[in-house]
Amino acid sequence: MENQPKLNSNKEVIAFLAELFPLCFTAEGEARPLKIGIFQDLVERVQGEENISKTQLRSALRLYTSSWRYLYGIKLGAQRVDLDGHPCGELEGQHVEHARKQLEEAKVRVQLQRAAQQAKKRENGEAASPRRPAAGKRPIKSDNVMPSKPRPKQERPAPAPRQAAAPVAKTVSVTDISMLQIGQAIKVKVGKNPMDATVMEIAKEGVRVQLSSGMALIVRAEHLQF
């Protein structure tokens, strides 16, 4: 392919690979499991293409194999394929389990991000709409009413000295889910801002918690804090 424009994004690289190797890569829909070591095969097959580099190939391949549609295709009994679509061995159980955990963690991250965004929107909405002061009643004018004398100004008491802020309690990461109890208050790590939650169920695959927003989800121990 001569005079091809330079590819600038992972999405463009994946589309390029899907066009070049349609029996291996797909631009949309469920993806097929790839042969182990396929990166080296890619380098050898596209080394004459001036519009793509090894770094771009590696980055695009990493994105492709971590996408939800690829992880959905990692199932027991599925066959890995090479660049030409030839089967290269059945998936092993450990690889299927690893993909399942990756998919679960990706879903949890998305749910937590959505919950954090909703909480932020609520906070911004409350801050942007301050309460209107209640309208006072207008005084009724009358010729027979004597004007009231101005009240003497009262001296305001001196403000009390500010108290030192209470120290922020440090949180501890959960290392063993057997330490948790149903109904226990806990925090779920979402970036730099942990979110309050309550333990609803303790299962083998993780801990089901309910966020303060009402959203329930299953979280792995490494995402929890006391």
From Swiss-Prot:
Q: What is its main location?
A: cytoplasm
Q: Name the GO cellular-component terms.
A: cytosol
Q: Where in the cell is it found?
A: Cytoplasm
Query: InterPro entries annotated for this entry?
Result: ProQ, ProQ/FinO, ProQ/FinO_sf, ProQ_C
| Keyword RNA-binding found | yes
Region span, Disordered: 111-167
Instruction: Give the keywords, sorted.
Output: Chaperone, Cytoplasm, RNA-binding
Gene Ontology BP term (one): post-transcriptional regulation of gene expression
Q: Which GO terms describe its molecular function?
A: RNA strand annealing activity; RNA strand-exchange activity
Write out the function statement from the record: RNA chaperone with significant RNA binding, RNA strand exchange and RNA duplexing activities. May regulate ProP activity through an RNA-based, post-transcriptional mechanism.
Family statement: Belongs to the ProQ family.
User: What is the protein's name according to its record?
Assistant: RNA chaperone ProQ
Give the species this sequence originates from: Sodalis glossinidius (strain morsitans)
In the UniProt record, what gene is named as encoding this protein? proQ
